[in-house]
């Protein structure tokens, strides 16, 4: 009897660690290519518009807009963001947990797709035109913002600085990514991404009917 009990304890102790290891969740990571960036900055443009120029930047990962820009964190496609907005409108509880009022009124960001273009609006209170940078990394629109926290008053490089980064994927066969326009005014960033007409798309081929 004693030997059977000891054998049972030995078997249970050898099996338990393996079962716990099976339940351990897997960790995945995703890297983004930031070579040959086409970026929008404030050089050579009057007013609040953002002009286009080319540069190369080192690979860098920043914090996402966890408060006002969560729908685009991490990188999402346009269709995913539009589907997410549909869910917000249909589910008031989900809207409230993602920075939208229970009535469905959007707060902090908005995105609309029309026949001619995709219209994106992001509220960035406390940030100026010089604090915001837009870039195209391959087919991904990257929005970065950096500004000082007035409450902390820290110097550059200290914890008083706020840094934000968020991304949205743009298919180059649907949108004219070389004609993106951006405007920053009164703490609101507006981005217009023109769409290609059907006859301009090289992935659409008309088939002749005999």
Swiss-Prot record:
- Classification via InterPro entries: A-crystallin/Hsp20_dom (IPR002068), HSP14.7/HSP23.5/HSP23.6-like (IPR044656), HSP20-like_chaperone (IPR008978)
User: Where in this protein does the record put region Disordered?
Assistant: 145-165
Q: Where is the sHSP domain?
A: 100-210
One GO CC term of this entry? Answer: mitochondrion
Compartments where found: Mitochondrion
| Record: transit peptide | 1-31
UniProt entry tagged with the keyword Ribonucleoprotein: no
Q: Tell me how this protein assembles.
A: May form oligomeric structures.
What PANTHER family does UniProt report for this protein, alphabetically?
A: 23.5 KDA HEAT SHOCK PROTEIN, MITOCHONDRIAL, SMALL HEAT SHOCK PROTEIN HSPF
What is the name of this protein? Answer: 23.6 kDa heat shock protein, mitochondrial
Native source organism of the sequence = Arabidopsis thaliana
List the top taxonomic levels of the source: Eukaryota, Viridiplantae, Streptophyta, Embryophyta, Tracheophyta
Task: State which gene encodes it.
Answer: HSP23.6
């Amino acid at each position: 009897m004693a030997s059977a009990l000891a054998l049972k304890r030995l078997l249970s102790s050898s099996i338990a660690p393996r079962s716990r290891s099976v339940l351990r969740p897997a960790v995945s990571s995703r890297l983004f290519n930031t070579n040959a960036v086409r970026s929008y900055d404030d050089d050579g443009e009057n007013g609040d518009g953002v002009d286009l120029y080319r540069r190369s930047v080192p690979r860098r990962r920043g914090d996402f807009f966890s408060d006002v820009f969560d729908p685009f964190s991490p990188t999402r496609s346009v269709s995913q963001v539009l589907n997410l907005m549909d869910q917000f409108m249909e589910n008031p509880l989900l809207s409230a947990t993602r920075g939208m009022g229970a009535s469905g009124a959007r707060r902090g960001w908005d995105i609309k797709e029309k026949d001619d273009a995709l219209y994106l609006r992001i509220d960035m209170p406390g940030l100026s035109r010089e604090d915001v940078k837009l870039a195209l990394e391959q087919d991904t629109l990257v929005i970065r913002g950096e500004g000082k926290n007035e409450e902390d008053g820290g110097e550059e490089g200290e914890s008083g600085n706020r840094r934000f980064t968020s991304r949205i994927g743009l298919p180059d066969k649907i949108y004219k990514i070389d004609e993106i326009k951006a405007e920053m005014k009164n703490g609101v960033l507006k981005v217009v991404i023109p769409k290609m007409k059907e006859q301009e798309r090289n992935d659409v081929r008309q088939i002749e009917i005999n």
